[in-house]
Structure formats: C-alpha cells, structure tokens
A protein has these predicted regions:
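A compositional/biophysical signature of low hydrophobicity enriched in polar/charged and small residues
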Residues: 1-119
Length: 119
C-alpha cells in the first residue's frame, strides 16, 4: 500500500525509485566486471573519483580479497570495451586489471524486506 511505501521511505529502507534501462536497447551489448589492482592504497580517493567520470562504469565496490576495487562496465561491444580499458582505465595508473565478461544476466533482484524482529 502507499502508506507502507511511505513508511519504508521515511525509515530510509527505500532510497528512491529509478528507471531500469535495457542496455541492449540503447546499444550496449557487452557487460563486463573488472577487478582493479591499485599501485598503492593512497590511490583509492583519486581512482574512485576518476571512475565516477567514466559513464560506462555503472558500479564500483571496495572489496576484500584479491582486488582493491571491483567495477561493472557496459560497452557497445568488445572493441569498445578494449578502448575503455586502454583510453580510460589504464591512464588511472592501475597496477593491473582482470576482466570477466558476462554472457547473459540470469536474474537480478532486490533483497527481501522483513521489518519484523527475529528475536
């Protein structure tokens, strides 16, 4: 109900609403995930700010494990992805990158909302 949605919004559970763009309908056929290795921890602020300026980078996460940052990129095709890597990512002074190309998104969903105490 609208009252419930308003309550969830007021609690900060719902942050807003957005349109979901079909990347293939707007010409972006390639979805890639990239693990980024930084040369030094001091690069985090400058690299994340630079990544915000690259429109094809749609997500950026600080991670544990082998990568310093993990990003999601949409590109028109594999050649465009290569161009993004060479012309936009390499100039950031990264130690190295690892790419994973997604063939197809199997599913995507939001986490379930359970506001009841589980005590």
């Amino acid at each position: 109900s609208d009252v419930y949605k308003r309550q969830l919004t007021n609690l900060g559970v719902i942050k807003g609403s957005e349109f979901i763009v079909d990347n293939t309908k707007v010409g972006y056929e390639t979805c890639a995930y990239m693990g980024l290795y930084l040369k030094s921890p001091g690069q985090f602020p400058s690299v994340t700010e630079a990544l915000k300026e690259i429109p094809e980078v749609v997500e950026c996460h600080y991670t544990t494990g082998q990568y310093d940052l993990f990003i999601k990129i949409y590109a028109k095709n594999n050649q465009h992805l290569l161009s993004i890597i060479h012309n936009k990512l390499q100039p950031l002074g990264l130690a190295r990158t690892e790419s994973l190309i997604s063939f197809k998104e199997a599913f995507k969903r939001q986490i379930p909302i359970d506001l009841e105490d589980e005590d």
